[in-house]
From Swiss-Prot:
Substrate binds at residues 264, 321-323. Residues 9-244 form the ATP-grasp domain. The keyword Manganese does not apply. This is Succinate--CoA ligase [ADP-forming] subunit beta. GO terms for molecular function: ATP binding; magnesium ion binding; succinate-CoA ligase (ADP-forming) activity; succinate-CoA ligase (GDP-forming) activity. InterPro entries: ATP-grasp (IPR011761), ATP-grasp_succ-CoA_synth-type (IPR013650), ATP_grasp_subdomain_1 (IPR013815), Succ-CoA_synthase_bsu_CS (IPR017866), SUCC_ACL_C (IPR005811), Succ_CoA_ligase-like_bsu (IPR005809), Succinyl-CoA_synth-like (IPR016102). Heterotetramer of two alpha and two beta subunits. It comes from Burkholderia cenocepacia (strain ATCC BAA-245 / DSM 16553 / LMG 16656 / NCTC 13227 / J2315 / CF5610) (Burkholderia cepacia (strain J2315)).
Amino acid sequence: MKIHEYQGKEILRKFGVAVPRGKPAFSVDEAVKVAEELGGPVWVVKAQIHAGGRGKGGGVKVAKSIEQVREYANQILGMQLVTHQTGPEGQKVNRLMIEEGADIKQELYVSLVVDRVSQKIVLMGSSEGGMDIEEVAEKHPELIHKVIVEPSTGLLDAQADDLAAKIGVPAASIPQARAILQGLYKAFWETDASLAEINPLNVSGDGKVTALDAKFNFDSNALFRHPEIVAYRDLDEEDPAEIEASKFDLAYISLDGNIGCLVNGAGLAMATMDTIKLFGGEPANFLDVGGGATTEKVTEAFKLMLKNPGLKAILVNIFGGIMRCDVIAEGVIAGSKAVNLNVPLVVRMKGTNEDLGKKMLADSGLPIISADSMEEAAQKVVAAAAGK
């Protein structure tokens, strides 16, 4: 789950991280009111969407008068903001953050992530803040420094000080940087975050260290422990299909391709998408119906996939372990009839009650294309999507 910058800064404040004064605004008049409350002479008007690259897309403006705050708020609020993370369609800006201006001397980068290789939390830092960190990692990997944090001890003073020095924090400002890094770590740990990022971490001309941006992602499996985080959820920023899928306990993620995928098990789902791509196709979604799929869930899965206007074919790939193939077959038949399926459907199933499931599909009268292996299924669905 993602949250907005202003919400991330609320979390950082709770853990003692220095951030500029600012508030969200949902209208132009509210933006002006917030600016007047903050006082000048400089304000930053920021679009609030769940994507990076807002500045390059025109979603962050520096205002030097109340009139400019009004002008920029009017420009940004309601705009379709396109960044490298939104795709060409962009995201509509429904809220702003109005923040006091900052004296920027150094822009640094720090973040915390879970490293699956070391199975530890990793603190990363770079002197190249304010930029796309993926670009820095690709072109100048030597500028990214890492510290492995032991969960049993947390981020030690020496570790924080060492990283701060390596990324260019002046010696006199290292105690401030240490407090921010340790506060960021505590926020990451105590909220079950999967990402906590400050980009940029600013060092001002007088040596003051502040977090000018805040980005958090949270582990959805841990949200039951954090109702205060769930309260931050903004459904306007989420894919409507993914919201609908969550109501039926379906793991669904929209993609850019034209081949729908309905699979049981996340690992098999990813392998299925890889195989489709291997044969020249493009998956339209990730969809895991899980081990307890019912006819209703399969029907809803078909409805979700068919909401994609670019869908050209569907591949159902089932391994019947916990989930029986005859139950899936029943769901496929009911789902196909319920939605008046009008795109080619390829089905491959193996495992428990496989023969019964295949017979049910064959006797259904539906134009289902059967396959015995994942490779055959992928080849057939790619051909079907291409109209061959």
